[in-house]
Amino acid sequence: MPTVPSIATPRFELVSMSLPFMEALARRDLGAAEHLIGAKVPTQMPDDLEHFLEYRILDLTVEPGWQPWLGRAIVLDDPRAGRRVIGSVGFHSPPDASGQVEIGYRIEPEFRRQGVATEVVRALFEWAWREHGITSFRASTSPDNVASQGVLAKFGFVQTGSQMDEYDGEELVFERKGWRPSS
């Protein structure tokens, strides 16, 4: 499996979550996961982690070349607590036939409302634009997730519909076409 370079932001390092890392998380082998990612991982795992890992492990097993597009751990280098994972961000897959990618992100509760999502989403959009010329983005969120909708609004996303997700239930669908850095 190729090594995928990290993406640096002013406050964080976005470290690609490799297949071995995700397999270690799925086994709840936190020691192995921490060794592989180079940071402490939360001991309290989100409720939807198993579902996320199931899909991403299958994706990377079948399509190893997808790794740069998929999940990245948001790593904070905290002078007091050391390097630790405080969330994740990534695309659901490489671009579709129209050149669009769908983004997803999750921030640990204690780090929400501090601009983390905005910073890491911007960094991932800039990477997709700089490395692959991507200017069309999609996102889906629960109707109740006002904070996530606020992040999307900052990037000029508009709601284009809704959908029923077999796992998450009703989701609002947002799109942003023609995105460029600083737009």
Region locations from a protein language model:
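GNAT-family acyltransferases
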Residues: M1-E102, I107-E110, A123-W127, E131, ...
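Short Gly/Pro-enriched loop/turn and capping motifs at secondary-structure junctions
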Residues: E110-R112, N145
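Glycine-rich acyl-CoA binding loop
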Residues: G115-T118
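Conserved beta-strand-loop-alpha-helix junction that forms the acyl-donor binding cleft
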Residues: A139-Q149, Y167
